[in-house]
Swiss-Prot record:
HAMAP family: CutC. It comes from the Bacteria. Pfam families: CutC (PF03932). The keyword Cytoplasm applies. This is PF03932 family protein CutC.
Length: 243
């Protein structure tokens, strides 16, 4: 079976680069430093307009931080799902937990029902749930299509033992997709030792600003942004290395 590559894309242009590099799918996100948040309507619509072959999945995450949501946040998520359906994207990506660290089954069912007929991926909320094997069975019962996971570790290489067990227990009932720290120099190892067939990675490079006048004394964001005059973007040549 051909290796399926999903690119974590932070912009419409990153979606273009991912498609040019031969990726199968993108997860379109804003707020990458926060782990990914819902992109704007304009970004999603532009990504759709500029691509023709690649599947676009959109993260539905109203904020960074934990995965315990208020009703106001849930309403926002439902509206964003409706917009994604209107724009005819391929799928949506979300994950919700209870205060005790379990999958919030009623809320996930509510969101999955709202998302139909779109594909649904449970994101790395799974990696901070209390019991991954119970969560696995719950997500299968809910009709989730795939789980994005680092094996409840800081990166997918460290999570190989759990990822392999999840693939075994899933037995084709749901797709287990390793992500976080998947690189061209370790994807073969992860593939061989887990049996996974889909992989999530960023394949980004730094893009330097073309600004000539620069006032570097006035930052526009927090200290986690290294410079106002550089951004990151999917690199089609890096994508090709994973295919």
């Amino acid at each position: 079976m051909k290796r399926i590559i999903e690119i974590c894309a932070n912009s419409a242009q990153s979606c273009v680069e991912a498609e040019a590099g031969g990726a199968t799918r993108v997860e379109l996100c804003a707020g990458i430093p926060e782990g990914g948040t819902t992109p704007s309507y304009g970004e999603i619509k532009t990504a759709k307009a500029l691509t023709s072959k690649i599947d676009i999945n959109v993260i539905i995450r109203p904020r960074g931080g934990d995965f315990l949501y208020t009703e106001a946040e849930v309403q926002s998520m439902l509206l964003d799902i409706e917009l994604c359906k209107e724009l005819k994207v391929h799928g949506v990506v979300f994950g919700c937990l209870t205060k005790d660290g379990d999958i919030d089954v009623p809320l996930m069912r509510r969101l999955i029902e709202a998302a139909k007929p779109l594909s649904v991926t449970c994101h790395r909320a799974f990696d901070v749930c209390r019991d991954p094997f119970t969560a696995l069975e719950q997500l299968i019962e809910l009709g989730c299509d795939r789980i994005l996971t680092s094996g409840q570790q800081s990166d997918a290489v460290k999570g190989i033992p759990l990822i392999a067990e999840l693939v075994k227990r899933a037995d084709g009932r749901i797709i287990i997709m390793p992500g976080c720290g998947v690189r061209e120099n370790n994807i073969g190892k992860i593939e061989a030792e887990t049996g996974a067939k889909e992989f999530h990675t960023s394949a980004r490079s730094i893009v330097y600003s073309k600004m000539e006048y620069r006032n570097e004394n006035v930052p526009m964001g927090s200290s986690i942004v290294s410079s106002e005059f550089e951004t990151v973007q999917t690199d089609r040549e890096k994508v090709k290395a994973y295919i």
